[in-house]
């Protein structure tokens, strides 16, 4: 089974910066977002030198589910993490999550996932691994791998706020509401009764390079910057971690550092974690 260690080792051994030259126009990949997602898949299956048939077999071997643009997650590793891939076009911009708040853990009973995802394998919950790529034109400038449990608060934090807003909207007098999973849906607003209003939440979250700037800073003179943060509990569960340790020892541009990160539910508490950082040369 593949995991984050395999992906990081593959990235260090195969640093690809130009997504356009590598992916666009091939295999129905027509935009940078799709190219980034395919790149992430290739990291987990070591798929850069595989032909399409070999790649399909590797996907089947390592992934139980590949998703769509409407429902999380983007992919699930067999017996492993759920993965969400997010593209950012500006180095410091926030990430739009649209109508769903961040999830620390993905559960099989989540109303956000598809029936196919729920039955893709025998599972109850999965760690959520967010993969953030900063893309400038055709080039991948930075990539971050961060587990949501180290990045987002418990679901109750977001759900409580959402329900308070929803309740407040529904107490407005003189309008006709209809049941909805959104914050509100109001019917027949105008005299003809032909206009409706949907009230939707639009969630944003700061990108991880800003959130974790107290333990990692990008060097903008580099053509490519990479960071991954893995809490110690997860790190100890990764049985192939020695493979990455050995690779980093022989890679001048890579480092493995012990750090302390803030608990997303209580920033007064710190937890031990590993920071993996890597860079590629000077930018042109």
Predicted regions and their residues:
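Short acidic loop-to-beta-strand element that houses the catalytic metal-binding Asp/Glu
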Residues: 69-82
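Nucleic-acid endonuclease domains
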Residues: 1-72, 87-284
């Amino acid at each position: 089974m593949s995991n984050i260690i395999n992906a990081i080792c593959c990235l260090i051994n195969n640093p690809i910066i130009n997504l356009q030259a590598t992916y666009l126009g091939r295999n129905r990949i027509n935009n940078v977002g799709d190219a980034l997602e395919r790149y992430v898949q290739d990291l987990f299956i070591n798929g850069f030198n595989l032909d399409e048939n070999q790649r399909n077999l590797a996907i089947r071997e390592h992934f139980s589910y590949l998703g769509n643009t409407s429902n999380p997650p983007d992919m699930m590793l067999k017996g492993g993490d759920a993965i969400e891939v997010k593209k950012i076009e500006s180095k410091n911009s926030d990430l739009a999550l649209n109508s769903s708040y961040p999830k620390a853990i993905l559960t099989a009973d989540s109303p956000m996932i598809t029936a196919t995802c729920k039955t893709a394998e025998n599972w109850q919950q999965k760690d959520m691994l967010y993969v953030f790529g900063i893309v400038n034109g055709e080039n991948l400038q930075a990539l971050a791998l961060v587990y949501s449990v180290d990045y987002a608060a418990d679901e109750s934090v977001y759900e409580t706020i959402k329900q308070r807003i929803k309740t407040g909207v529904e107490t407005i007098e003189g309008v006709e509401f209809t049941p909805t999973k959104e914050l509100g849906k109001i019917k027949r607003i105008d005299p003809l009764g032909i206009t409706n209003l949907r009230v939707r939440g639009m969630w944003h979250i700061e990108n991880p390079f800003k959130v974790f700037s107290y333990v990692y800073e990008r060097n903008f003179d580099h053509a490519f910057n990479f960071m991954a943060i893995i809490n110690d509990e997860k790190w100890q569960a990764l049985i192939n971690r020695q493979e990455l340790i050995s690779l980093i020892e022989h890679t001048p541009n890579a480092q493995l550092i012990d750090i302390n990160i803030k608990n997303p539910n209580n920033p007064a508490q710190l937890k031990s974690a590993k920071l993996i950082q890597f860079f590629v040369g000077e930018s042109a």
